[in-house]
Amino acid sequence: MGFTDKGRRGYSRTRRDLLSGASVLALAPHTWFDFSDLSTLFQDADGTTAVAADADPIGKVLDKSGNAHHLTQGTEGARPAYKTGIQGNRAAALGDGGDHLDTAAFTEIAQPNTIFLVARNPAYSGTEVYFDGIASDKRHAAFDYTDQINWFAGSSWGGGVVATESTLYEVVFNGANSPLFENGVGISSGDAGAQALTGITLFGNFEGGGNLSGYIMEFLLFNSALSVANRELVRSYLNEKWKVY
């Protein structure tokens, strides 16, 4: 990372700017959910009651990209919980195996798309989905299955370990050449398929199954194959913030 505090004013500005997320916002993310940012979290789907304390339900999450791709859940019993002090002394959302959050449909975006995910699945069992689309033929998905994380956008391939410890994943959905990075290290590349994307589900699949019993800290989607330098910028922001590795 290269951030060592030696008392220089320049260091403080650099680290503060990185953690502000301003440099990430300048890359024009398509969709951005941050479960440590209380200003974006509400207990109800209408966004009238703010999340304020540990174990509060999360019924709405504002999209920090500015594109208004907000997540909602209208069913009280299917809302993940806000949990404090989970990773890097920051809060995360916890799914109990029966929760999920969904965006409304947005304008279809074709591949390539770059997705960053910070998550933890400490009690992995069977098939558990971190994220998915909202329609059967317009999906980008990540799910734990057969002791590895799998990626799907029409075809499925496995690469990377299950996040029993907090993990920073980044994947470029780019058809037959879809590379995966885990905690900054290139793991593998495979064929994820060529489907476009029209919406996002977190903590489960688009049909309401495969629900995650674990944590999601942050999710970022870019409608492009980010350059190496820009992926490093986003990765640095996420790791400096969440202290994953």
Regions found by a protein language model. Name each.
Residues 34, 114-116:
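Active-site-flanking beta-strand signature of metal-NTP-handling nucleotidyl enzymes
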Residues 59-98, 108-109, 116-125, 131-194:
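Extracellular glycan-interaction surfaces
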Residues 156-157, 196-221, 226:
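Extracellular glycan-interaction patches encoded by glycine-rich segments
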